[in-house]
Regions:
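Sec/Tat signal peptide C-region and signal peptidase I cleavage site
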Residues: 54-58
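A structural signal for short loop-to-beta-strand junctions that line the ligand-binding cleft
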Residues: 149-163, 286-295
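Extracytoplasmic small-molecule ligand-binding "clamshell" domains
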Residues: 77, 81, 90-123, 290-291
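Bacterial N-terminal signal peptides that target proteins for export
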Residues: 33-44
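Pocket-lining segment of extracytoplasmic ligand-binding domains
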Residues: 135-137, 145-146, 176, 212-304, ...
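Bacterial N-terminal signal peptides
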Residues: 45-51
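Bilobed "Venus flytrap"/periplasmic-binding protein-like clamshell domains
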Residues: 63-98, 162, 166-232, 327, ...
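An extracytoplasmic/periplasmic, membrane-proximal ligand-sensing/linker region
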Residues: 10, 19, 221, 225, ...
Length: 368
């Protein structure tokens, strides 16, 4: 049973991972870096239309941020869909009358960020109300193990829901001669920024294949910047951990002859055996135009908040996430939205549930 008092433990031993010690120190977050995205949409428009005509209405208004990732990756649009689904600004029409079916008085917004590590740190520091993170990054942060060994455990981190699988993409030009992770030796490879879950997993994958960061020339590029650098010959390959299909790779595949490099064999088996949050999976052929499918490994994308967040608020947010109207928005809002289901809401959860989320899942019969 997953609960704040009885958190499940993954097959993780403290101190097993060494090459990523440079990522053990929490990322210092520059507030000016954050970009509140355009997904405030109809919710904010409705409030502006009201003109905040009365003090009573103004007092009912509450904002709630969701840290996502780079704008070219899956976290960002999914965050926008969820923000819309859980929002219901003061003065909105009732749900049954065709209005929003979110939380009364709430305006949620998706926030672009560096990714998983950045979001976890922002939640713990109070900079963001919630955020998405890879299951491995969150577990290590919560326990102070793995890549977070030496950091103070983020014991206030709490889970709202498991969302979808994220697949590790290793991308190279089709004629690059890079056919395996081992072929990255001596190459220029983008590992994403140190504040991202991709960076963490890239180091783990290289370690499993006998490579250290000193065996290649690392770069720290995200999304479209990595794609452009690959097209222009400035890098030889790049990693990205994201739900497929992701926008930056859809665009890249339509403009250039690329390949996905498999992450498989003994190295993949070692990863899935050593770390319980990794699973063997595949990126199917046809996901990206003209690109063959490959075997790879995957991790879970999950939604987190702080234990300090109001129980009633998180209960209502969780309830709104899983109502019928939210289901419709998820199904049409993004290809990965269909994978976000109540049946898998607790899949792979290694950080305790927030008390408000736990209450909803018990009422819904998901937790017994």
């Amino acid at each position: 049973m997953v609960s704040a008092s009885n958190p499940p433990l993954l097959s993780q031993t403290k101190g097993q991972f060494d090459p990523a010690r440079q990522n053990a120190t929490p990322v210092k977050i520059n507030k000016e870096y954050l970009m509140i995205n355009t997904f405030k949409t109809a919710a904010i428009s409705a409030v502006l239309a009201l003109g905040m005509a009365s003090t009573a209405v103004a007092q009912e208004l509450r904002f709630f941020t969701i840290g996502t990732g780079g704008t070219a990756y899956t976290y960002y649009p999914i965050g926008g869909v969820i923000a819309n689904a859980i929002s219901k600004p003061p003065g909105s029409r009732e749900c049954g009358d065709g209005g929003s079916c979110g939380v009364e008085g709430l305006i949620a917004s998706a926030v672009s960020s560096r990714g998983s590590v950045d979001n976890v740190n922002a939640i713990i520091s109070g900079l963001r109300d919630s955020g998405f993170a890879q299951s491995d990054v969150a577990y290590w942060a919560y326990t102070g193990t793995g890549t977070m060994e030496g950091s103070e455990p983020a014991t206030d981190l709490r889970t709202i829901a498991a969302l979808f699988e994220e697949h590790i993409h290793l991308v190279a030009m089709a004629d690059s001669g890079i056919n395996s992770v081992a072929d990255l030796a001596g190459k220029r490879v983008s590992l994403d920024e140190p504040g991202s879950g991709t960076y963490v997993d890239a180091l783990l994958i290289m370690e499993a294949n006998g490579l250290a960061i000193d065996d290649l020339t690392p770069e720290a590029l995200k999304g479209n910047a990595a794609s452009e650098a690959l097209r222009n010959g400035k890098i030889d390959a790049f990693f990205v951990v994201t739900g497929y299909p992701t926008g930056s790779l859809v665009e890249l595949a339509s403009a250039a002859d690329i390949k996905l490099v498999p992450i498989d064999g003994d190295a993949a088996a070692t990863l899935t055996e050593k770390y319980g949050f990794f699973s063997s999976s595949e990126i199917p052929e046809g996901t990206y135009e003209g690109v063959a499918g490959v075997d790879t490994v995957a991790v879970g994308a999950q939604w987190f908040t702080s234990a300090k967040a109001d129980e009633e608020l998180i209960y209502n947010i969780t309830k709104a996430l899983w109502n019928d109207e939210s289901r419709k928005l998820l199904d049409v809002g993004h290809a990965k939205g269909q994978a976000i289901t109540l049946d898998t809401a607790l899949a792979g959860v290694g950080v305790p549930l927030h008390a408000g989320a736990e209450r909803f899942y018990r009422e819904a019969g998901v937790l017994k």
